[in-house]
Amino acid sequence: GCCPTFWTSFGSNCYRFFAVSLTWAEGEQFCQSFSVPSRGDIDSIGHLVSIHSETEQNFVYHYFETSTKDDTTPEMWLGFNDRTTEGNFQWTDGSPNDFTAWVGSNPDNYGSGEDCTQMVMGAGLNWIDLPCSSTRHYLICKLPLWE
């Protein structure tokens, strides 16, 4: 398989970094504007990035870090959220909840209104929950590889 122009492949998926200031829902909608030719049972639409292993986490973090090197405190949306059921985090692409990299006491649902997830600068554990209505300046969209 291959990735569309400007997208980067890793494993069986394609990733693209964008410097766009959007809320979480706007970011997910933005990612859904990208697609690859349908493969039937596999979702061919883009979503905010999901992460399923330490190697994928490291890849995404390195891509994020190298794309934002002029920014000292960059923050980037991930597709992980518990908007449907508090405490039950899910990925927007429907993939399994099988990996997390929360910082410290996160997710803490501070002020009972933090249902979305961002990645922050700092290798290793770097996910923090925050209000979905917040604006973040960066995101990575994820697509399946073209067959």
Curated annotation (Swiss-Prot):
Known partners and oligomeric status: Homodimer; disulfide-linked.
Listed name of the protein: Echinoidin
Assigned GO CC terms: extracellular region
SUPFAM superfamilies according to UniProt: C-type lectin-like (SSF56436)
Tissue specificity of this protein: Coelemic fluid.
Disulfide bonds: C3-C14, C31-C141, C116-C132
Cellular localisation: Secreted
Cited InterPro entries: C-type_lectin-like (IPR001304), C-type_lectin-like/link_sf (IPR016186), C-type_lectin/snaclec_domain (IPR050111), C-type_lectin_CS (IPR018378), CEL1-like_CTLD (IPR033988), CTDL_fold (IPR016187)
General function of this protein: Role in the defense system of the organism against microorganisms. This lectin is specific for Gal-GalNAc.
Recorded superkingdom: Eukaryota
C-type lectin domain residues: 1-143
Keyword Disulfide bond belongs to the record: yes
Keyword annotations of the record: Disulfide bond, Glycoprotein, Lectin, Secreted
Record: glycosylation sites: S38
Record's keyword annotation contains Secreted: yes
Motif (Cell attachment site): 39-41
A molecular function (GO) term: carbohydrate binding
CDD domains for this protein: CLECT_CEL-1_like
PTM note: The identity of the saccharide is not reported in PubMed:3571253, and it is unlikely to be N-acetylgalactosamine. The sugar attached to Ser-38 is represented simply as Hex.
